[in-house]
């Protein structure tokens, strides 16, 4: 049987048996009333108070837990024993009620704790007493039937009804069994009724009198049916109220037990009494809940009055708030009028800016070309990236040196291990010498001297080991220092990169400002992207115009200084005027005979002959960026000896065509130091 412990089929069979036993127990309780005996499984609790539904849900088959499943199987077996004992105890109580002919079961106190044998013996004794009583009743019934058949009328004029009544009183049927449905007649009453209807030797003037009793009723009483239906309806209402208020319902559990055991059959008197008791418990619980709800209702009424007062205060505050909002609306109207005036003023300023834009359209093409300066900046950043690669190669070289030092450290470790093995060998020799001490007493002194020498060698080896450890620590310190230098170099490179990227972002932002906001009303073929906010666009346009104005003022200052220098040179006689025909002839000869000019000039982040953006000039004029070499003046093309200078001819031609370019070229020739400082601002010479 051990292999069946925990079997799902066995456990399901036990669960069904427990369900059937519980239904039978409820049926007996409905007829004899609940009996209160201690439980065999749980001695501290009454057997009739056990919640079998909860126990069956808890002790169930669990696939993943065999230990708990076996325990549940054992508990189910014990519960079967417990329910069987309770069934025997309740049946014994029911038999006692039948023996004593008690229709309503009396209230019983809690019974003693009885063993299985005592319970079975008590049940058997009750069953024997009932059997003896039933035999006595059967014998008495047979004797009464014999007397009825052999009896004759004593008087001729005696009515038949009186003899029938006397016979009926003589053969009185046994008392009805309490708890059985009243609609079911006794089987033993049928022959009695036959004997009453067919008396021997009846007179001609006799007549039958029919009487309806509880024992002979074939259908339930209409009043009982109506009362029980009303009781069920009231019970449903009470249970629904308890469920709606989240209250435990004793009547609901009792109704479920009655429905499982009896279905929709008429209830006995004992069950109706228990039904009324459980219903009164639920009604008392609902009465307490109604009292609490009334208290809460009174409290809610008080809160309602307080809320009304708060509503009045809030209405007054709302009126004040509305008045304040009206005042704010008036102030907002005044502000709107002021903003309208400011808008008109801004429109007037916009018209002024349009006139200024007309004067700055000539410089727009040069500003477009200045975007190429960013490309030169990118080339410089690429060169710096190459420098970073060179630094990374140096770091790799340092790492190789660190690996070399690590190899040396491994060699030193191997030497230390060799020394330790030698030391172990010497120790083994010493041990062998000690073992052979008795046989080599003559050589003891020599061995002692050799042992001293070995000790000295051991001390020397220990010293060498300490030196190797010190060298290893020194190598580790060098390795840490090299790693620190590497990390420092990496940090410096990252800082340099971040600084260059930040400068690149600034240059791009300046370029974007000067390219995206030169004018709010550009032609249709060159529309700029607007941010959607006219005020922000106008502020950016004003910023760009301020930058242009500052650049133009600086350019005017340089032009004035160049004019003064030109006038001084002209007064000294250094300038000569050449006719235009000779200039063209000289230029053509110079172009045919001159070698191609060399364009190998080192410049700052803008190509020679290209102008920076007005916003980017402060970054290049008068100072250089970190890591940026100073720009050198552009190299002049070589000339053959004996030829006229094509540069002079070109210079005079450009003077005739563009005075600004001529002044810039003359400034570069007269003041080379200023040309080296800011070559990015020199205008580019165009071939004619």
UniProtKB/Swiss-Prot annotation:
Low complexity: compositionally biased ranges: 671-680
Domain of life: Eukaryota
Name used for this protein in its record: Coiled-coil domain-containing protein 157
Encoding gene, per UniProt annotation: CCDC157
Residue ranges of the region described as Disordered: 143-162, 168-189, 322-341, 366-385, 592-688
Species annotation: Bos taurus (Bovine)
Record keywords, A-Z: Coiled coil
Ranges annotated as biased composition (Polar residues): 143-153, 369-382
Keyword Cell wall biogenesis/degradation: no
Protein's UniProt keywords contain Coiled coil: yes
Coiled coil (UniProt feature): 288-572
InterPro entries: CCDC157 (IPR029681)
């Amino acid at each position: 049987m051990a292999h069946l412990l925990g079997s799902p089929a066995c456990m399901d069979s036990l669960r069904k048996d427990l369900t059937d036993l519980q239904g039978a127990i409820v049926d007996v309780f409905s007829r004899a009333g609940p009996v209160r005996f201690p439980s065999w499984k749980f001695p501290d609790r009454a057997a009739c108070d056990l919640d079998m539904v909860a126990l069956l849900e808890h002790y169930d088959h669990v696939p993943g837990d065999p230990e708990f499943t076996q325990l549940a199987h054992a508990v189910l077996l014990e519960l079967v024993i417990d329910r069987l004992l309770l069934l025997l105890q309740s049946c014994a109580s029911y038999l006692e009620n039948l023996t004593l002919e008690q229709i309503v079961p009396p209230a019983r106190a809690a019974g003693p704790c009885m063993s299985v044998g005592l319970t079975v013996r008590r049940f058997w004794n009750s069953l024997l007493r009932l059997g003896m009583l039933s035999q006595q009743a059967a014998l008495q019934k047979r004797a009464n039937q014999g007397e009825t058949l052999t009896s004759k009328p004593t008087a001729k004029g005696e009515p038949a009804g009186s003899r029938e009544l006397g016979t009926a009183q003589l053969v009185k049927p046994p008392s009805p069994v309490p708890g059985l449905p009243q609609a079911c007649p006794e089987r033993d009453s049928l022959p009695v009724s036959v004997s009453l209807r067919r008396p021997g030797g009846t007179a001609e003037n006799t007549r039958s009198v029919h009487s309806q009793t509880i024992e002979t009723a074939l259908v339930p009483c209409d009043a009982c049916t109506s009362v029980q239906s009303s009781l069920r309806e009231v019970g449903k209402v009470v249970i629904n109220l308890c469920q709606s208020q989240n209250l435990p319902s004793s009547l609901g559990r009792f109704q479920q037990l009655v429905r499982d055991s009896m279905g929709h059959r008429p209830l006995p008197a004992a069950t109706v009494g228990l039904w009324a008791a459980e219903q009164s418990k639920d009604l008392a619980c609902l009465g307490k809940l109604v009292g609490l709800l009334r208290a809460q209702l009174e409290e809610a009424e008080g809160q309602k009055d307080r809320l009304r007062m708060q509503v009045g205060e809030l209405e007054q505050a709302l009126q004040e708030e509305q008045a304040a909002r009206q005042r704010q609306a008036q102030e907002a109207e005044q502000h709107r009028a002021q903003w309208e005036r400011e808008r008109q003023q801004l429109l007037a300023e916009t018209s002024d800016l349009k006139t200024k834009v007309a004067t700055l359209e000539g410089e727009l093409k040069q500003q477009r070309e200045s975007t190429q300066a960013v490309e030169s900046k990118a080339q410089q950043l690429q060169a710096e990236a190459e420098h970073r690669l060179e630094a990374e190669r140096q770091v790799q070289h340092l790492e190789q040196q660190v690996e070399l030092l690590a190899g040396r450290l491994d060699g030193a470790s191997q030497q230390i291990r060799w020394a330790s093995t030698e030391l172990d060998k010497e120790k083994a020799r010493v041990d062998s010498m000690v073992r052979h001490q008795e046989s080599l007493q003559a050589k003891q002194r020599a061995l002692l001297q050799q042992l001293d020498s070995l000790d000295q060698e051991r001390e020397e080896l220990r010293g060498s080991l300490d030196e190797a450890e010190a060298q290893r620590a020194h190598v580790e310190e060098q390795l840490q220092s090299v790693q620190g230098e590497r990390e420092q170099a990496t940090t410096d490179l990252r800082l340099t990169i971040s600084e260059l990227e930040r400068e690149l972002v600034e240059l791009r932002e300046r370029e974007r400002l000067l390219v995206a906001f030169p004018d709010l009303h550009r032609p249709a073929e060159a529309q700029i992207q607007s941010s959607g906010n006219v005020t922000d666009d106008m502020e950016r346009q004003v910023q760009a115009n301020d930058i242009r104005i500052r650049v133009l003022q600086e350019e005017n200052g340089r032009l004035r200084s160049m004019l003064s220098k030109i006038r001084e040179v002209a007064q000294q006689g250094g300038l000569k005027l050449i006719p235009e025909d000779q200039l063209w002839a000289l230029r053509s000869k110079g172009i045919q005979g001159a070698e191609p000019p060399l364009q190998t000039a080192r410049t700052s982040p803008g190509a020679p002959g290209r102008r920076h953006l007005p916003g980017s000039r402060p970054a290049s004029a008068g100072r250089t960026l970190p890591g940026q070499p100073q720009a050198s003046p552009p190299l002049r093309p070589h000339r053959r000896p004996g030829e006229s200078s094509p540069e002079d001819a070109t210079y005079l031609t450009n003077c005739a065509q563009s005075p600004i370019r001529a002044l810039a070229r003359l400034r570069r020739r007269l003041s080379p130091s200023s040309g080296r400082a800011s070559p990015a601002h020199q205008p580019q010479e165009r071939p004619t």
